[in-house]
Amino acid sequence: MFSELDLLDFATFDGGATTEAAFASPANQTYDLSSSVPSSVSNMGTVSPQELLLHEPYLSAPSSTALTALTSPSLFDGSPDFDTFDISPNFGHSDLENPDTWFSLFPDATPLPQAQAQVQTQPQTQTQTEQQTQPLPELVQSVQPTVQPTVEQTVHSVEASPATPSEDLEVLSPGSGHQRRKSSVSPPSGRHSSVAGVGSRRRDKPLPPIIVEDPSDVVAMKRARNTLAARKSRERKAQRLEELEAKIEELIAERDRWKNLALAHGASTE
């Protein structure tokens, strides 16, 4: 009874124009934007955003390459020609090009005020100036109490050192003139090297004693202590060498004894 009607067959309120003419694309009809699309898929009743945003400069290219998804510029803040259109989200040029409007990812460090920096640096500068302008006698008095205990402590440590009594160290006492206090050192009566037949490598004459005329002289006392330590080290090395030489002689004698015993029982020398 009723025939099937299409939406495009209805007339609009613009004076009898068809729906297809009313909803046609506002783009220039000279170029067919759907030429690259099959006719079965193309529908002139729909309007795409790209067709609405086409301007005259872009109509010089074919419809298939006018606006593509890969090569065309971005429609959002992509060209000054699009500034007249209200395109969502409508990012302006100033919003993207000015880095001052960007929010900081990390909290900004508060700079130190210049006045506070001057207040903090002023006492240090004043203290340095006072130290530089301090008279020389006051500096000597401020340094002397710290040096004097060091001298006394050094002399006491050298005199109380356990290595001092066993070495030839002579210290001239201040009130005894040229009298010398010499440590009692008794050299060993016999040497192990002479018994083992090893030649002695020590000095024929004893080393001269170490004399310190001024016990308050820190440099002289330190030099004497270093000399004593060096003599003790050389003495220990010499004794160790003599012990090793004696051990070698003992092993050689034992080897010769076992060798002669083996030869007496008919062992071959090869």
From Swiss-Prot:
It comes from the Eukaryota. SUPFAM superfamilies: Leucine zipper domain. InterPro entries: bZIP, bZIP_sf. Residues 114-135, 153-213 are annotated as: Disordered. CDD domains: bZIP_GCN4. Binds DNA as a dimer. This is Cross-pathway control protein 1. It comes from Neurospora crassa (strain ATCC 24698 / 74-OR23-1A / CBS 708.71 / DSM 1257 / FGSC 987).
